[in-house]
């Protein structure tokens, strides 16, 4: 069936659907089997039904003008070409002047409503993350998008993400108040609501439109302690007090790319709307310790004082996309610092504070064995401490190589690799930190061996190379969604660093080894199908105590 094949060439695979829906790419990770669509429809209906039972209004994807990049050739449509995203061809944008805009958007909403009913909110993000708007009348485009949505539900609200230039000001400035709700996506770091101190400040904020104060916090689902506690609290109360922004502020939101990390920060952002007056991080953390562990304990209070004053309190002016990344997960290099291309991470805390927090947690670990929240945090804090140690050791390796000191190089590189294996062992005690949990979830979505293999490949690629060679290397996407997890540490990150150290050892021996092709090494793992268990191994407290004693 020609049409089905063409549709499948357009829709992205399960690991990359989010980027397809944001107009960043098409087709990558697919083609999907028919059972995938059936399964997703069934799941979506369950989610929407349950949301409505709870009185939650779902935000469904609205029509943003997206059509396949070859829609001009295939369908004769009048389109604008938004260009490329990290080497992927973006879908084209259907010009509002094309008479078929109305027809296609109406068809889209008709089918959507047939499946999931009408809603009061539709998510629409044209030209997300740098798409070219050349040749597009933005005012007309905004009005056409709004008109199409309103035909489906006259009371519906367009929901847009404020990220970089999206939504473009000319597209929204003439829309009626109340028709648009903007998610200020990165409020704790790069707010656009009108804060003059922000590098992404929009003069006049969002004008007449309502907006939501959102914490982004996590990029790529990366693992690592991180937060901007003071900036998050202060930013919210500053916005509330602002003459203009305070009038149009509608609430708070969470917009992370990956969840199941840094639970303390989600607790904190959700506290904001309930507290009329500004409060301090210190006073809030006192209550948090009891809420988190069900006990009052001086050592645990000290842990959170150290973390709250340090790694969880990145200053507002330190622009950083997510966590302080673990060097274990980096594509190797002598002066490697950040793992993903756009992390922009900065030194803003004392690593010794993290190690001291880990020591305190280990000191009371016997007392709280079996306390689930404590054991999760014990692993997470000790994981961060090991990553700090790894960063120091990697610098020793580099210094020894540059000094031509073979003995120190050999010792330091072996110690670094051993730290990766200890990290792997520690994380294996919790299912949340196991690559097996991730792969098992992906495989379980498939009905046949072929489907399971496709979904596993999507899952493996997303957390390693992310794309093909061009997207990974020139596009910068490799390691974007890296995971400091059990299984992948041992088999992927260890392998990569060992290959690099072997290469450097040859150089120290005066040989001229062939340059390493990292992508080839990485791609091999994405094609493997070796089993990873999701079942925790070892006693968390015993393993954590032993590792701490050995390393620190």
Show the residue positions of the predicted features.
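Extended non-globular C-terminal regions
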Residues: 373-387, 391, 415, 441
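Substrate-recognition/cap regions that form aromatic- and gly/pro-loop-enriched pockets
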Residues: 382, 424-425
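Acidic/histidine-rich, surface-exposed loop or edge segments in extracytoplasmic proteins
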Residues: 28, 374, 394
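Short, solvent-exposed, charged loop/turn and helix-capping segments
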Residues: 364-378, 426-441
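C-terminal substrate/ligand-recognition segments
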Residues: 347-361, 365, 380-402
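Extended, compositionally biased alpha-helical segments that mediate assembly or anchoring
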Residues: 485-552
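Catalytic-core regions of glycoside hydrolase
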Residues: 1-25, 29-308, 313-315, 320-324, ...
